[in-house]
């Protein structure tokens, strides 16, 4: 009997754990929307302007929220604190919640302070953000209604035989994502600001943690480099690179900021021709395309670089799925990359790839070898050699 009772207890514990797990995932959107709420109310900026710590009362005043609604904000902040977006402290000597509770920035929320916050404020503002790139435009773009709403139709889209050629985004919005970006000025601005913000952070990490990747390179082409944000970070960090070209579609490079030091811009189609250089760089490019198109892009890359003995290589900054589970943080990153895979599938029928899928593309395009360097974040650096 004792054994049966223990077995029953184990079953109950397992059921309750499964129940908790399902609720956690089913309500995952609430976490995204709590984050969006904090961005809408400019909470990170307010904390930064208050010197890195702000009371609930200060957040209420800055957000123009009525004191009668203070408990709503307290509960949102409690959730975001549990998510480690913010930190919180409590002064037991103060009875009023608005004065007793104060909130601080964490490494995550420091990334959400707008780029203008610290410089706009007078003395006393936190200076930590001056060396921390803001990814506020990127995160704000990811939690827009237009971004999230299309996921409601994923199941029905998968049943459609045309899904292989028509993305979920196009099915829902009657227009492909790239066309929407170009046809809508507000959407275009949001998209490029989002990409630039992400690029500043990723490239800061790349040039600091993996400088060896750029050793010996005298000429570089950033393929699909947009407005030159990634290339600018490279030439600033590595002055030995004598020639750096940003290649993208003509209408994209036409919007590049004028006078970017050390860069030239080339309008063209990467499926047709890529300018020659010692090395090529592709950041978040190949995950937008199916395998056949990736092979074609890599074939053009191979034509554009010299042999391995001359230092020729392709530098890919992208995700490698399922490659890191050495500790808890790496395991979380691994799970998050699978979510990113569904995100990119929904928008452009793209894919994040496992190492064997990357290898298949490289070999099919005529490359002989590659080396993967993992970062502590989502992207990895893949050096591909002819």
UniProtKB/Swiss-Prot annotation:
**Which portions of this protein are annotated as coiled-coil regions?**
none
Signal sequence bounds? none
Q: Which GO BP terms sit in this record?
A: biosynthetic process; methylation
What is the pH-activity profile?
A: Optimum pH is 7.0.
Write out the catalysed reaction. TRIBOA beta-D-glucoside + S-adenosyl-L-methionine = DIMBOA beta-D-glucoside + S-adenosyl-L-homocysteine + H(+)
Q: Which UniProt keywords apply?
A: Methyltransferase, S-adenosyl-L-methionine, Transferase
Residue positions annotated to bind S-adenosyl-L-methionine are: 224, 248, 270, 283
Q: Which InterPro entries match?
A: COMT-like, O_MeTrfase_dom, Plant_O-MeTrfase_dimerisation, SAM-dependent_MTases_sf, WH-like_DNA-bd_sf, WH_DNA-bd_sf
EC code: 2.1.1.241
Q: In which tissues is it expressed?
A: Expressed in seedlings and newly formed crown roots. Highest expression in the scutellar node. Low to non detectable levels in cob, tassel and mature organs like husk or leaves.
User: What molecular function does GO assign, one term?
Assistant: S-adenosylmethionine-dependent methyltransferase activity
- Positions of the catalytic residues: 287 (proton acceptor)
Which Gene3D superfamilies does this entry report, sorted A to Z? Answer: Vaccinia Virus protein VP39 (3.40.50.150), Winged helix-like DNA-binding domain superfamily/Winged helix DNA-binding domain (1.10.10.10)
This molecule's function is given as: O-methyltransferase involved in the benzoxazinoid glucoside biosynthesis. Can use 2,4,7-trihydroxy-2H-1,4-benzoxazin-3(4H)-one 2-D-glucoside (TRIBOA-glucoside) as substrate, but not aglucone TRIBOA, caffeic acid, ferulic acid, apigenin or quercetin.
Q: Which PANTHER family match?
A: O-METHYLTRANSFERASE
Q: Which family does it belong to?
A: Belongs to the class I-like SAM-binding methyltransferase superfamily. Cation-independent O-methyltransferase family. COMT subfamily.
Name this protein carries in UniProt: TRIBOA-glucoside O-methyltransferase BX7
């Amino acid at each position: 009997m004792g054994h049966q009772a223990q077995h029953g207890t184990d079953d109950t514990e397992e059921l309750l754990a499964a129940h908790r797990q399902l609720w956690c995932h089913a309500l995952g959107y609430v976490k995204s929307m709590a984050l969006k709420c904090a961005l809408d109310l400019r909470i990170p900026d307010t904390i930064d302007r208050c010197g890195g710590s702000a009371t609930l009362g200060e957040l209420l005043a800055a957000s123009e929220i009525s004191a009668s609604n203070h408990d709503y904000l307290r509960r949102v902040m409690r959730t975001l604190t549990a998510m480690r977006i913010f930190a919180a402290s409590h002064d037991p000597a103060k009875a009023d919640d608005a004065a007793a509770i104060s909130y601080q920035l964490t490494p995550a929320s420091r990334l959400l302070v707008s780029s203008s916050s610290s410089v706009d404020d007078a003395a006393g503002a936190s200076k930590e953000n001056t060396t921390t790139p803001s990814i506020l435009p990127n995160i704000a773009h990811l939690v827009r209604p237009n971004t999230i709403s299309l996921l409601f139709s994923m199941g029905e889209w998968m049943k459609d035989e045309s899904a292989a050629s028509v993305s979920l985004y196009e099915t829902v919005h009657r227009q492909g994502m790239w066309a929407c970006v170009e046809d809508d000025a507000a959407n275009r601005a949001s998209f490029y600001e989002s990409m630039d913000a992400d690029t500043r952070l990723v490239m800061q990490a790349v040039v600091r943690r993996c400088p060896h990747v750029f050793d010996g390179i005298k000429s570089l082409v950033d393929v699909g480099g947009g407005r030159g944000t990634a290339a600018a970070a490279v030439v600033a960090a590595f002055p030995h690179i004598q020639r750096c070209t940003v290649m993208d579609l003509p209408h994209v490079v036409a919007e590049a900021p004028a006078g970017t030091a050390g860069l030239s811009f080339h309008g063209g189609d990467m499926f047709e021709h890529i300018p020659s250089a010692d090395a090529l760089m592709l950041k978040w490019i190949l995950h937008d395309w199916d395998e056949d198109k990736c092979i074609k892009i890599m074939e053009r890359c191979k034509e554009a670089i010299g042999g391995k003995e001359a230092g020729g290589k392709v530098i890919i900054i992208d995700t490698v799925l399922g490659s890191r589970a050495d500790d808890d943080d790496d395991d979380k990153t691994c799970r998050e990359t699978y979510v990113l895979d569904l995100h990119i599938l929904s928008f452009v029928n793209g894919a994040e790839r496992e190492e064997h899928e990357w290898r298949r593309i490289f070999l099919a395009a005529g490359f002989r070898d590659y080396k993967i360097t993992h970062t502590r974040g989502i992207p990895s650096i893949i050096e591909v050699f002819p």
